[in-house]
Amino acid sequence: MKKKFGKLSLTTLAVLMSISAHLQAAESSDKKKDQAPPIVTPGENGSAPSDAIVLFDGSNLDEWQSGDAAAKWTLLKAESAMEVKKGTGVLQTKKTFGDVQLHIEWATPSEVTGSGQGRGNSGVYLQGRYEIQVLDSFNNETYYNGQAGAFYNNAAPLVNASRPPGKWQTYDIIFVAPKPQEDGSVKPGSFTVLHNGILIQHQTPITGKASTAAAYSGATPKGPLVLQDHGNPVRYRNIWIRELN
Ligand code: MG
């Protein structure tokens, strides 16, 4: 009797385990079906993936404006690039964005003039408010939270990953926007930045305090991408963005 009970018990256990395994497999399979990630085709050599908004591919400045007027910076079609036109002011996107992944390439002038903040200065402002500094920081001293890759006036880069003047460089930026709350407070955001593929900002907090000389102030759900005219002929190319919210 004891032996029989043991057999039954083992059989029951085996059946229960089998049912449990089937249920788990079915649940896992359903989860995969429900949550299948969208297919995105990567770009070649840093070009835009299939789900990105192309902001600049070298052919035109249609996505950009200077204030309320047409874009005034110089289009260099032969190089698929654009260049800061001194004195015309910032260039900004017509579209506005919240949380994003941004890819942008830039080059400071190969002919070196000036020093410190006067050498190859421009900047990439998320929402026109929070500047990731563009500067020739190759053998060029300045204050640390103002060098290339700094969250300007807030946080120095973790390392100096600068290429020499005139060379093309990349920023890949994950920006989580500070979010204005109903009670008037601001939920902090963050910057994660790769400079030439090297991590230089790692979830750096953004409390809502704008960078000095920002185009706009105050936290906002969405704002334009803004490129700075700091009087130096800095070039940009291959700019694309993916919306994350
Ligand atoms: Mg700047």
Predicted regions span which residues?
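Bacterial N-terminal signal peptides that target proteins for export
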Residues: 1-12, 21
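Carbohydrate-interacting regions of secretory-pathway proteins
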Residues: 23-245
